[in-house]
């Protein structure tokens, strides 16, 4: 078990500097008990310094984490989530068997440092034992878009516990630090940029990633910041969604990233609401007014497409020169409204299964705007997303599946929002509601063949 590491950060000014030392204490079974982090004196004197996350203020001396959060969220955000951990554990299990040794008890820090440095999420980097290189070094090149069918097949075999050594090598080489439970990898685009390839899961009941592409395009039309993305059909009813990594700039430089889960310092099984999230984002934002309004627009979108997988890890911020800004939206998926599903409440005492867009309007003050401005935004988002069925068809979704998903879009919340359009002047310039920039390689939007993908990040 690894018990300590030196931590580095790529600063917005382009320098990579030592930031501090991290040590962890774990039980015999590998369960993390506590951790301790201490900033270096040089970092605390650096004019470009910033607190890595709310749990780690810029102070001298050790900062201890224990109890329900035994390691600071910024470190967790740079490591693997459920999908990545499953891959790394499978690789360790296979290595232990091949070497005839007991299975190692891996701590959170072990998982963090096992991630390949090249594809690690955010701007943090690690070294161990005073070594000169960052861990973990990549053994092979990051896969490219031509490897997508092979990645899909390997992920499917892994889900069925039939993966080979070659499968595990490919999937771990493709990166394990992206969050979430769904299969996903890092790939390199033809122009050399890193991108996320979200893969179909073996138990998908509909074309999940085509619907995510649909929702991203609707978000763009509604004026929400989205990453550039393309949809790559694999079979008639499944596809891979490839989107640019927004924690890298156009030159490949790293950009600091924190999840909403880290920002709100959410405890296990605790409930964080959108009013909690917008408050903490505004506290740390370079432009709190703009980010608060953007958050309101995203919540309106969430309610109008019934995106229920909107937990705090599916929100994030990126480091700027003097503070943080909301990242482009990600992991937005419609869900059939045929049964109630718990999701992020609008306010601390709000309903988790029956979120009401009328209540969102009542909460407009928490997002830094008056009710009239909030009504305008809701009406704009409703108009921009009203053509959801046509956009879904553009992405190759079959008519029967469009009908199946209609309850996600044609809801009581949409009826309420649609009534607002009769009294509000709509800004039709948002995101180009008559344009379809995001496309699939084989199914470009009919009127705009050859257009570039959606806006970059």
List the predicted regions and their residue ranges.
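Phosphate/dinucleotide-binding and metal-coordinating scaffold of catalytic cores
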Residues: 1-312, 316-430, 455-457
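Short Cys/His-rich zinc-binding micro-motifs
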Residues: 431-443
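Long, low-complexity, intrinsically disordered segments
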Residues: 444-457
């Amino acid at each position: 078990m690894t018990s300590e590491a030196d931590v580095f950060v790529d600063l917005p000014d382009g320098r990579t500097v030592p930031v501090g030392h991290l040590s962890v204490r774990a039980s015999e079974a590998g369960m993390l008990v506590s951790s301790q982090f201490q900033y270096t004196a040089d970092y605390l004197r650096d004019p470009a310094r910033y607190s890595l996350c709310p749990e780690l203020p810029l102070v001298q001396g050790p900062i201890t984490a224990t109890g329900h959060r035994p390691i600071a969220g910024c470190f967790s955000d740079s490591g693997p989530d459920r999908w990545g951990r499953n891959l790394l554990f499978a690789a360790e299990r296979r290595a232990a068997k091949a070497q005839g040794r007991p299975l190692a008890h891996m701590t959170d820090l072990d998982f963090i440092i096992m991630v390949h440095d090249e594809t690690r999420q955010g701007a943090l980097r690690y070294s161990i034992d005073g070594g000169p290189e960052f861990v973990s070094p990549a053994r092979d090149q990051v896969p490219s878009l031509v490897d997508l069918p092979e990645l899909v097949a390997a992920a499917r075999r892994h889900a069925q516990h039939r993966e080979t050594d070659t499968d595990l090598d490919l999937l771990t080489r493709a990166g394990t630090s992206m969050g979430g439970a769904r299969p996903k990898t890092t790939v390199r685009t033809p122009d050399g940029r890193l991108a996320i390839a979200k893969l179909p899961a073996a138990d998908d009941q509909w074309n999940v990633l085509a619907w995510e592409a649909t929702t991203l395009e609707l978000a763009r039309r509604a004026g929400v910041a989205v990453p550039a993305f393309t949809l790559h059909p694999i079979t008639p009813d499944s596809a891979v969604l490839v989107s640019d990594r927004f924690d890298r700039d156009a030159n490949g430089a790293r950009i600091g990233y924190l999840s909403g889960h880290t920002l709100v310092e959410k405890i296990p099984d605790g409930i964080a609401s959108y009013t909690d999230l917008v408050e903490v984002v505004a506290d740390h934002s370079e432009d709190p007014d703009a980010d608060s309004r953007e958050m309101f627009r995203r919540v309106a979108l969430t309610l109008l497409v019934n995106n229920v997988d909107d937990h705090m890890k599916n929100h994030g911020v990126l480091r700027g020169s003097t503070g943080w800004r909301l990242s482009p939206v990600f992991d937005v998926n419609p869900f059939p409204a045929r049964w109630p599903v718990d999701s992020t409440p609008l306010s601390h005492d709000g309903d988790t299964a029956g979120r009401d867009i009328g209540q969102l309007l009542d909460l407009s003050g928490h997002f830094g705007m008056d009710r009239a401005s909030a009504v305008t935004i809701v009406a704009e988002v409703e108009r921009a997303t009203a053509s959801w069925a046509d956009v879904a068809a553009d992405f190759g979704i079959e008519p029967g599946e469009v009908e199946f998903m209609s309850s996600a879009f044609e809801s009581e919340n949409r009826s309420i929002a649609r009534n607002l359009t009769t009294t509000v002047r709509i800004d039709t310039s948002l995101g180009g509601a008559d344009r379809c920039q995001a496309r699939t390689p084989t199914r470009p939007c009919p009127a705009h063949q050859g257009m570039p993908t959606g806006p970059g990040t």
